[in-house]
């Protein structure tokens, strides 16, 4: 009895039946209204619980009486029974409409209908996407369908209203806001079941699980396509059919009072505000419920308004679903009744904005490498002022105006720097436009043309200086020597040629077409300028040029001309030599060439000097100048002595050097050719003898002599005339001036890339340091390296003077030859890669594969060959297919037996392992105690016929092995055959 009471309480709490006083309060109702509904016999009768049914059928507790009281035929005769019998399924969503038949207030509607998708923008309020909160179980819908007649479509629609899945899935009939219209059942019975209805609605507000959805699809008689896809917009034709059917049905409804009309209006407003015009307009009632004609018209008007609003919203939604395209979120809703999905997808813009990378701005925008913005006009103006001394306004008329632009500031600064180191009346020598040198005294008003200036200035300088003042002049005179730096002094003053001669220059490319004849014509026609200064464009700068033959009629000797000219043919063959002569001042204010050094290995040989080298002498073209014969030798001595100021570096000799009165010339020494280097491998064959000339040693400060070197162009010329120190002449020269001392001949050395001019060494020679701080803010020259020439490349820089060693030691190596040399000497890396790729990834590399102890010991079952087979990658030829990394299955299931493979590497006889010597066990694997006991006994029979402990196997009759001297090529696995009904052959543990 107690068990029955407990089961009864449990079922009552779930059903939440109304109190028994409910029929008593309904005293005014008719007897038909008080009767509970009659359920069809299709619903099977069940006991209240499984526990009570099991105990009652056992015959212990009043089985006959209890079954008679709980029968279905006793329900009409019992007036005090609750409205809902125990056998009724309380989870049925629509039983209240048939059982109670009362009006349900708005409180009965569940408070939560669903959640909306997250959107923003102007059209966020018009979206109709709803995430459905469904029931916890679907079995009630199936039971309801089984207990009701399934022919009425209105009951399907009514069930879809009660079920959250069917309501929001838009069934075939309607998709508007729901409005429930109830029958005229007494109000008192409805109030009694309010708590029960709320409890039921709260239980229905659940989200379907996948099991419920699968159960619903299998048990629900209505096709799934009728309610899928959810949230789909209804077509106008379907709406018209639904509205027509609803109007026909509404005419059959029972009339109601005006109070119910107001309740209907309130219900419609409340439902519309809750659902945002997304639910269906459905009229549900039983056969006993009806409406008046005015209610029919009101409901039709309400449906029309809702339909019009729905169409307008759908048009706006179809036009632009989202006002803000920066980001869109969408809840992906599955087809059918699967409800919502947990996936949230983000849709970015279809065309993202173009991103500006900084690399794209370098070519088109005004940015330097430090990402600093600058102005093109400002930079162009600064560049023109730096190069031409004029703004870009003066250059607007074309490239032809560039030839007439002068740099007045540079001109004044240059003349002031030169005049500060020249004595009064001395002249400066500047290159002309064709590469020739003219004398300039710094006075721009001295004449009207180049010829008058050259003659007058030269006559003035010669007349003021006599032969007896040569010693004084030599200390103050300046030599014109090209240097290898452009920073020592300002660039020469630009010339102003005739504008008519360059009128054909219209564009930048015309500058490259200017020939020497055009420049000569321009120089001859420019008589209105006070003097001709060296003109050259930015891409062709003035160079020292040579004439094919010497001209002795102009008053200048070949020695003077040789000091300023170079062979034009040699100049054309050596284009890579720097062609820009600049002028640098020595510490004492003298011009000197930086490429002239002294050779410590030079030896003085008594060689005859002939005058045959005179045609090769480089002369200065001054054909327009005519001087008296008396001044020729004086002028020659002055200029020659000034040129040699740097050549001897102010060598003060205490012992006189005797020179022959006869004219001497240089006799070249035998050429010394180093070892030929033709390829990269020849560099390793060079010996120390080839590096003798370019060996690293000390500088001039540690030597008593210097070595004069000239460029490869100057190697074809004889030596430069020497300078007279005191009353003695030092060195050899070719000059018509008679000398009372004999000078030994100076040998010359030749190399493929350089030529050395060697002067004889003298005793007690002291070198005056030339590295003191120069005057007038001029930068000092780099220290001349011993036995070296300037590096041979296109861009000349001051760093070349500091490179030690001769050019004979520098070789231009082809990179392809160097790569080929190393490819022959070493193995290609691809060969190693091929070998590595042929080895499987899971191959067990041992530390020492040749170790017999680790390869054949029973403690290490992985040998040389077994370690490779253990990888399970391949046993024959490697394949390039991807394989699953699944481990090897050691059990094979057949129909009648199961074969299991066990590793027997540790089950070998002790004598077999002892034949190879004692092995050291690994740290990772320690044999069990039973195995160690068996090994310590050393019995061959025991180890061969009895199991050896953990992991060992029970040998069969055919699995016995005799002791062997070497390991077999087996995989380390032995089979065990197990019968279906016998477990005797299974492995056993030995204690």
Curated annotation (Swiss-Prot):
Residues 24-33 have a biased composition (Polar residues). Involved in maintenance of polarized growth and daughter-cell-specific transcription. Keywords: Cytoplasm, Zinc. Residues 605-614 have a biased composition (Acidic residues). This is Zinc-regulated protein 8. Residues 1-11 have a biased composition (Basic residues). Its main location: cytoplasm. The gene is ZRG8. It is found in: Cytoplasm; Bud; Bud neck; Bud tip. Residues 1-51, 68-92, 165-192, 306-327, 516-546, 564-588, 603-631, 847-866 are annotated as: Disordered. One of its GO terms (cellular component) is cytoplasm. It comes from the Eukaryota. Belongs to the ZRG8 family. It comes from Eremothecium gossypii (strain ATCC 10895 / CBS 109.51 / FGSC 9923 / NRRL Y-1056) (Yeast).
């Amino acid at each position: 009895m107690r068990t029955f009471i407990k089961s009864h309480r449990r079922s009552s709490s779930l059903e939440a039946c109304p109190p028994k006083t409910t029929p008593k309060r309904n005293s005014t109702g008719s007897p038909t209204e008080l009767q509970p509904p009659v359920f069809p016999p299709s619903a099977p009768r069940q006991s209240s619980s499984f526990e009570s049914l099991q105990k009652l059928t056992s015959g212990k507790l009043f089985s006959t009486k209890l079954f008679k009281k709980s029968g279905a035929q006793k329900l009409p005769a019992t007036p005090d029974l609750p409205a809902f019998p125990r056998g009724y399924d309380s989870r049925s969503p629509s039983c209240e409409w048939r059982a109670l038949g009362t009006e349900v207030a708005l409180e009965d509607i569940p408070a939560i209908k669903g959640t909306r998708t997250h959107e923003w923008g102007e059209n966020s309020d018009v979206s109709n996407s709803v995430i459905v909160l469904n029931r916890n179980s679907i079995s009630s819908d199936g039971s309801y369908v089984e207990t009701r007649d399934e022919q009425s479509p209105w009951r399907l629609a009514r069930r879809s209203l009660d079920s959250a899945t069917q309501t929001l899935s838009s069934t075939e009939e309607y998709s508007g806001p729901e409005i429930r219209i109830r029958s005229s059942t007494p109000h008192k019975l409805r109030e009694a079941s309010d708590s029960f209805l709320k409890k039921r609605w709260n239980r229905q507000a659940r989200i379907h699980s996948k099991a419920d959805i699968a159960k619903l699809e299998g048990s629900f008689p209505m096709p799934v396509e009728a309610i899928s896809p959810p949230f789909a917009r209804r077509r106008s034709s379907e709406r018209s059919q639904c509205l027509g059917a609803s109007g026909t049905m509404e005419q059959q409804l029972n009339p109601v009072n005006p109070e119910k009309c107001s309740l209907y209006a309130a219900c419609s407003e409340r439902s519309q505000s809750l659902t945002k015009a997304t639910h269906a307009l459905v009229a549900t009632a039983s056969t006993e419920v009806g409406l008046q004609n005015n209610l029919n018209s009101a409901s039709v008007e309400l449906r029309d308004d809702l339909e019009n609003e729905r169409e307008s919203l759908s048009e706006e939604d179809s036009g632009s679903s989202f006002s803000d395209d920066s980001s869109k979120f969408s809840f992906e809703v599955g087809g059918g009744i699967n409800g919502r999905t947990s996936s949230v997808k983000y849709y970015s813009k279809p065309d993202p904005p173009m991103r500006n990378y900084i690399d794209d701005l370098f070519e088109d925008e005004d940015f330097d490498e430090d990402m600093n913005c600058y102005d093109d006009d400002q930079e162009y103006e600064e560049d023109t002022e730096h190069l031409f001394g004029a703004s870009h306004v003066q250059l607007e008329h074309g490239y032809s105006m560039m030839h007439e632009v002068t740099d007045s500031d540079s001109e004044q600064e240059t003349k002031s720097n030169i005049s500060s180191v020249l004595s009064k009346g001395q002249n400066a020598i500047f290159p002309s436009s064709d590469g020739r040198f003219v004398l300039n005294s710094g006075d721009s008003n001295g004449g009207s043309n180049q010829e008058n200036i050259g003659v007058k200035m030269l006559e003035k300088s010669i007349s003021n200086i006599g032969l007896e003042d040569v010693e004084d002049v030599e200390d103050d005179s300046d030599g014109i020597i090209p240097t290898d730096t452009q920073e020592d002094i300002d660039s020469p003053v630009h010339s102003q040629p005739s504008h008519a001669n360059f009128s054909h220059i219209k564009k930048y490319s015309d500058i490259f077409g200017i020939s020497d004849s055009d420049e000569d014509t321009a120089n001859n026609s420019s008589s209105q300028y006070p003097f001709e200064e060296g003109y050259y464009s930015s891409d062709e700068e003035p160079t020292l040029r040579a004439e094919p033959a010497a001209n002795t009629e102009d008053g200048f000797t070949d020695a003077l001309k040789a000091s300023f000219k170079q062979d034009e043919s040699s100049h054309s063959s050596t284009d890579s030599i720097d062609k820009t002569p600049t002028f640098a001042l020595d510490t004492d204010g003298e011009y000197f060439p930086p490429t002239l050094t002294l050779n410590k290995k030079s030896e003085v040989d008594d060689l005859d000097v002939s005058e045959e080298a005179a045609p090769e002498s480089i002369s200065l073209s001054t054909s327009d100048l005519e001087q008296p014969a008396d001044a020729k030798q004086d002028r020659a001595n002055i200029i020659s002595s000034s040129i040699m100021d740097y050549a001897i570096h102010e060598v003060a000799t205490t012992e006189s050097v005797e020179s022959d009165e006869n004219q001497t010339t240089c006799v070249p020494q035998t050429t010394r050719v180093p070892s030929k280097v033709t390829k990269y491998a020849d560099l390793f064959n060079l010996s120390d003898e080839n590096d003798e000339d370019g060996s690293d040693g000390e500088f001039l400060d540690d030597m008593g002599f210097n070595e004069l070197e000239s460029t490869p162009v100057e190697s074809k010329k004889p030596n430069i005339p020497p300078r007279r120190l005191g009353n003695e002449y030092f060195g050899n020269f070719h000059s018509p001036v008679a000398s009372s001392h004999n000078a030994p001949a100076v040998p010359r050395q030749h190399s493929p890339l350089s030529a050395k001019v060697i002067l004889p060494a003298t005793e007690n020679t002291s070198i005056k340091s030339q590295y003191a701080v120069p005057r007038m803010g001029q930068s000092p020259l780099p220290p001349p390296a011993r036995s070296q020439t300037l590096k041979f490349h296109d861009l000349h820089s001051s760093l070349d003077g500091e490179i030690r060693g001769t050019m004979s030691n520098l070789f231009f190596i082809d990179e392809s030859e160097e790569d080929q040399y190393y490819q022959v000497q070493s193995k290609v890396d691809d060969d190693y890669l091929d070998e590595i790729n042929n080895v499987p990834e899971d191959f067990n590399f041992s530390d020492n594969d040749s170790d017999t102890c680790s390869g054949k010991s029973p403690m290490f079952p992985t040998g040389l060959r077994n370690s490779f087979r253990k990888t399970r990658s391949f046993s024959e030829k490697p394949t390039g297919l991807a394989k699953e990394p699944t481990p090897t299955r050691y059990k094979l299931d057949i129909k009648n037996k199961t074969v299991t493979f066990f590793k027997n590497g540790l089950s070998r006889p002790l004598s077999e392992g002892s034949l190879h010597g004692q092995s050291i066990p690994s740290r990772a694997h320690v044999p069990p105690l039973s195995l160690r006991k068996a090994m310590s006994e050393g019995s061959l029979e025991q180890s061969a016929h009895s199991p050896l402990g953990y992991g060992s196997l029970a040998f069969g009759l055919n699995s016995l092995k005799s002791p062997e001297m070497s390991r077999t090529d087996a995989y380390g696995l032995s089979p065990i055959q197990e019968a279906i009904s016998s477990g005797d052959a299974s492995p056993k543990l030995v204690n």
